Amino acid sequence: MKQDMIDYLMKNPQVLTKLENGEASLIGIPDKLIPSIVDIFNKKMTLSKKCKGIFWEQ
């Protein structure tokens, strides 16, 4: 399920923006965790732009 969420956010970056603005939520994820998820995801994306690739642990 975690990998599905990551795939979805990578394919739909507008959802990440809506999460940041409080315009969307993730089913099954408490609202209080959303800022942490957005922060981590943004850090990973920033790092991936500096690298040739990014690898997710499975």
From Swiss-Prot:
Pfam families: ComX. The keyword Secreted applies. The keyword Repressor does not apply. Keywords: Competence, Lipoprotein, Pheromone, Prenylation, Secreted, Sporulation. One of its GO terms (biological process) is sporulation resulting in formation of a cellular spore. Its main location: secreted. Residues 1-52 form a propeptide. The modification Tryptophan derivative is found at W56. It is found in: Secreted. Part of a major quorum-sensing system that regulates the development of genetic competence. Acts through the activation of the two-component regulatory system ComP/ComA composed of a sensor histidine kinase, ComP, and a response regulator, ComA. The DNA sequences encoding ComQ, ComX and the N-terminal two-thirds of ComP show a striking polymorphism, which determines the specificity of the quorum-sensing system in the different pherotypes of Bacillus. In ComX, the sole conserved residue is the modified tryptophan essential for the activity. Interacts directly with the sensor histidine kinase ComP and stimulates its activity. This is ComX pheromone. The lineage of its organism: Bacteria, Bacillati, Bacillota, Bacilli, Bacillales.
